[in-house]
Amino acid sequence: NIDWHRRYSHMRMHTAQHLMSGLAYEIFNGVRTVGNQIHSTHSRIDFNPISFDQTMLDELSSSANELTNQSIEITNSIMTREQINAIMPEDRTNMNLLPKSVKNLRVVKIGENVDLCPCAGTHVTNLEEVGSVNIISKKSKGKGTQRVTYELGEPIRTISPNLDII
């Protein structure tokens, strides 16, 4: 049996990670996501190169929360490397980490221009399902890397186990 509550929490957290990674890249001049870990109650993202101050963290969370209050669709599709690279810079998608022999990739896309990234994970279908993003800590991981930990507030809408929108 699938624990729907836990699965759905992971879907929300994972989508929030994509959102935060995409926003951080745009807001902070190409900062990259170099690691992440998704849990059902909190998650973390490692960014590099960056040294966040509180103003920067506030800007990141407020930008994320502005979007999670909007009905922005999240889709999955199969794309070629060339199609992905034509839309997003290779360093943003971490395409260099994938074997060159992999030609077609599953991608998650948030809205038209929020984020597009190769990913085989599970995600919600709309940003309104994520809830508010609350950054709860930051920690230096050395060599210009900072770890940001976040949790999520209640979403505007949810999906029940039988896929009804509530």
Map each language-model feature to its residues.
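Active-/binding-site microenvironments in catalytic and ligand-binding cores
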Residues: 1-166
